[in-house]
């Protein structure tokens, strides 16, 4: 293997307030905070693999872009569908709830206004909207997502 071999690409999302976004990504999406260094926050799963990076760039120190954002939706695929139900059992705020072949999925909006879809399905086409939110059973041993991947950036 050569030194120039790329093993994995980790997406970086610029945010205005890292602490506010850290709470959202950890509490709502079940990610694990791996490393805080300077303006960057590395997020991952229980395998301690870096999957997403938040970079703080306060609007007072950088030019704020006017108009539509380039990030329409961030699609995250979870290895275990039951972990999504464990997140929903916490009573988190979600915009849309879906049901698929493996289990539930949801869309939530970050403090920056980014739409994030968390699912465990092979194909997004099989997700159907759920009208009434069912009562989810709290899992006492749930500490966060065991494994996830950023599947798509739209």
Where are these regions (language model features)?
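Hydrophobic, proline/glycine-rich low-complexity stretches
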Residues: 1-8, 12-15, 31, 42
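Vicinal oxygen chelate
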Residues: 6-15, 61-154
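Catalytic cores of nucleotide-enabled group-transfer and carboxylate-activating enzymes in metabolic
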Residues: 11, 21-22, 136-140
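Conserved active-site tyrosine of GNAT-family acetyltransferases
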Residues: 21-26, 113
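Conserved acetyl-CoA-binding loop of GNAT-fold acetyltransferases
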Residues: 28-34, 92-95
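Conserved short beta-strand elements that form part of the metal-binding/catalytic scaffold
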Residues: 32-68, 115-122
